[in-house]
């Protein structure tokens, strides 16, 4: 009986930890990427009024339907795969455009909402964004040592910028300059 109770408690703890929701601290931290600066387009894109950039509302592998992202997000095993994915996406003319690209690290950081974590992004603007790293097109020049070239990433768990080995699974969100 005691073994069953302990097993049940451990299972419930694990389930509750995996279902942790996003936390935002707008009462103590000013919004860095407020929802009112973004214009949500019916075609599944988001126009950033501050930067002029147009973002895909959904990450690669998902599609935009009825104001949300559906499907299964696909992570990329390598930076080179993420960079080459651009040609595939542009061939599909997503939202009617053929000029999608991986954002640079500063562009991707511009949509981080530092008042939130788990993920550090406004989910009312960018639905279904996981708390995970996302590729940029920016190499990490400080870490080039003759081997694999690491890329700069933004980890949307807390909105941190870092570098990653090109073999780590990471997500992709495309951007374009209208």
What is each of the regions a protein language model found here?
Residues 14-18:
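N-terminal signal peptide c-region/cleavage motif recognized by signal peptidases
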Residues 6-11:
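Sec-dependent N-terminal signal peptides
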Residues 2-5, 19-101, 105-178:
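Glycine-aromatic-enriched surface loops/turns that form tight recognition elements
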């Amino acid at each position: 009986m005691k073994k069953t109770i302990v097993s049940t408690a451990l299972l419930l703890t694990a389930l509750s930890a995996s279902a942790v929701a996003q936390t935002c601290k707008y009462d103590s931290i000013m919004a860095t990427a407020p929802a009112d600066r973004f214009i949500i387009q019916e075609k599944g894109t988001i126009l950033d009024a501050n930067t002029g950039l147009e973002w895909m509302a959904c990450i690669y592998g998902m599609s935009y339907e009825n104001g949300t992202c559906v499907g299964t997000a696909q992570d990329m095993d390598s930076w080179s795969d993420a960079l080459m994915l651009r040609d595939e996406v542009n061939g599909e003319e997503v939202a009617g455009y053929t000029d999608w690209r991986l954002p640079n690290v500063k562009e991707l950081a511009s949509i981080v909402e530092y008042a939130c974590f788990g993920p550090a992004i406004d989910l009312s603007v960018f639905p279904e964004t996981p708390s995970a790293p996302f590729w940029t097109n920016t190499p990490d020049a400080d870490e080039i040592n003759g081997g694999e070239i690491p890329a700069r990433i933004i980890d949307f768990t807390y909105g941190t910028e870092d570098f990653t080995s090109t073999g780590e699974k990471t997500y992709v969100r495309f951007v374009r300059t209208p």
